[in-house]
Each structure stands twice: as C-alpha cells, then as structure tokens.
C-alpha cells in the first residue's frame, strides 16, 4: 500500500513507460527527431532497469531509481531548449516533461513490503479451530 497521497510504484512504472513512449513518438514525428527520441529512449531505459514489478532488467533499486528519475527529468527539461527544435515539438516535449515531473513527485518509492503468509486452518473444510 502506498503512502497517503502517493502513487504505488507499479503505477509509476506504467506511467513512465507511457511517457517515454510518447516522447519517443513525438520525436519520431518531428523534423529533427534526434533529441526527443534520445530523451524518450532514456526514459524507457530508466524504467526498464529498476527492480520492480514491470522492470525488464532489474539492475537498480528504488532508491537509486529515484535519483535517476530526477537526473532524467533534468536532462529532459534541458533537452526542451535544444537548438533547432521546432516550436510544436518543443511544446509537446515540455508537456511530457511536466507529466513526468508530476509522476516522479507523487510516487511512493518505499520498498515493497513482504507478504505475510496466512496460517491455514488445521481442521478440514475451513471450519474454525
């Protein structure tokens, strides 16, 4: 269960995959696709390497992923000011960065709590002991 007012980490991961895919798609639609496509790929790679439910490679923990999220957010924000980017692509990039910032800010990065095994009744057919 996530902390009050925070999103669960699995939801954070799904949102990052969507945001990364959107940034990649925005880059591929622009006249100069290099910068937005690289930023979208960076977001997707950052999401794929975390040790969490939807992590593909599970190389880093949640604490390090939180730091990497802020680094990726900074890179994405600086990339919005890249020279030679047309106005429409820049606006889409900026909106995607805002969504990513909200996702990062409102996520519960605490480690998953281990599930407690429930004791099974000693009597058959589920009758009370």
Please describe what each predicted stretch is.
Residues 1-6, 25-32, 51-61:
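Short juxtamembrane and helix-loop transition motifs at transmembrane-helix boundaries
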């Amino acid at each position: 269960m996530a902390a009050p007012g925070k999103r669960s980490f699995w939801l954070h991961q799904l949102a990052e995959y969507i945001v990364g895919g959107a940034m990649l798609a925005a880059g591929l639609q622009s006249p100069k696709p290099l910068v937005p496509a690289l930023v979208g790929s960076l977001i997707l790679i950052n999401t794929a390497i975390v040790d969490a439910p939807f992590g593909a490679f599970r190389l880093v923990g949640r604490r390090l992923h939180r730091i990497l999220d802020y680094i990726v957010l900074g890179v994405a924000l600086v990339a919005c000011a890249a020279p030679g980017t047309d106005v429409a692509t820049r606006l889409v990039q900026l909106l995607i960065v805002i969504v990513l910032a909200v996702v990062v800010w409102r996520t519960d990065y605490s480690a998953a709590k281990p599930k407690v095994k429930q004791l099974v009744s000693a009597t058959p057919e589920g009758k009370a002991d």
